[in-house]
Amino acid sequence: SQFRYHAFMNLDGDVWRRVSMGEGMTPIVSYNGNVFLKMDFMMPTLSFKDRGAATLVSHMKAIGVKKCVQDSSGNAGVAVAAYCARSGIACEIYVPEGTSPNKIAMIEGFGAKAVVVPGTRDHCAEVCRSKVKEEGAYYANHVYNPYFYEGTKAYIYETFEQLKRIPRHIFIELGNGTLF
């Protein structure tokens, strides 16, 4: 699990042990000699977003969060929904209209409430901020919450451990940039 690096993740205690679903330490395969590919689609919810979600939800569990909200257009929402389900935290994911029905089904499959918001992703974020003010929900924002990044940084620790060296170049998928 990525929590082999928990000492570097700014987490209190060992609540992560009850949250983790074995994310991290994904295989690295050689492609064309000097190019290596890290297989982060082999995470519990099929996305590198599990790295951040596992750590963020561990923090939420440690501080006693009962309900969270998040804006997402897909993978982060699925990951947060999954880890909240494992942790017993109520979860609402606000998605913009046009979000893949499969992503919505995955979010709901983990027991979270998926709410389609007319407009853009920014409108979803506005709804989440209002839920924080009105209901006291925790905003599990995967773009700005530093605990999400505490998890995604395990990517490079793993890469170093697996290759036994620092790669000369790293090319990563960006999405909205949460792994960068």
Annotate each PLM feature.
Residues 1-180:
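PLP-dependent amino-acid enzyme catalytic core
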